[in-house]
Amino acid sequence: MVCVGIDVAKDKHDCCILDSEGTPLVDCFTIPNNMDGFKSLLQTIQDCSQKSDKIKVGLEATGHYSYNILGFLLDNDLPVYVMNPLHTNLYRKSLSLRKTKTDRVDAKTIATMLLSDVDLKSYTDTAYHNEELKSLTRYRFDKVQERAKLKQSVSRLVTILFPELEQLVSSIHGTSIYALLSEYPGAKQISEAHLTRLANILVKTSRGHYRKDKATHIRDAARTSIGSVMPAKSLELKHTIKLIQELTSEINEIEDAIRKIMDELKPPILSIPGMGFHSAAMILAEVGDFSNFNSPDKVLAYAGCSLSTYQSGKLTNCYAHMEKRGSRYLRYALYTATKYVCYWNPVFTEYLTKKQAEGKHYNVALSHATKKLVRLIYALQKSGKAYLAVT
């Protein structure tokens, strides 16, 4: 057996190659993060191994720094094992009491872990392509968060420039109101606008939801508004709305790409009443291959939804808190999905109500419902069967 440990960095990668006895087959070496370096690593691995040797290549999950070398190794049909940095760090500390941590030591630690009896599963080509879905869902999440902050800015600016507007419309974040404020960013500008122009904007952009009488009400309110006349704030409002519109267009494009992947996957969890398309996509992207988890509890732990445990002598934690050490994206998707599933699925609605009746806080009861949902998701994805409602 030949075990290759790679410590990944931005500009270079440190490598260590051991045989089945743990003896270095070659001195630890460093390769640059480019194609010449990758080919040099591949050639060294081939020189150190025989055709009958089983080769294992291990590296840490270091985010985007490992994407390129991981793809190269998979393209060359090498079995790759991606490790949790927490595991490798603890394993390194268990090998020596000395506080020695260098890139080459880390590379040797990874290679040694491959030789041990640690339960590791190889990184499949399917998992590599699953990164596409993960990248898209995380990218969408960040864009939505960015847009939410800009919407808060719009609310703040409207409160300064035309505070009465919020009482006249169902939402100031609708397409028609954005169109109105883009052209007339303030009470003063609206009060001086021609009524026909105001009505045309509202009727056209709201698809008939608003009519001329709404334009009249808005202009009348603008003429008696207490809003400040601040050209700088009006300019900021116009630009902020433009940024929101651009972000919305980008989010729609991202969602189209996600939908294409989801249409190919046809995941069983979409059959759960209340399970949203976006939450399902993020859950699948973050978990990846469910066969990597031998129980639903492992999925919960990966999401950081497991309860922490502390016991020392007679002291035992009475109020255990959530670990929150896993994927924050998965944790967010699970809790968002649970809220909607509890609303639309009678079984989960009853379960949530039962937990609250036991005296549990809503968030605690929701966490119990999340565990129940994870068990259901795990069962559906493992079996490949759609959800069947209990009658």
Regions found by a protein language model. Give the residues of each.
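A detector of single, family-specific signature residues
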Residues: 1-391
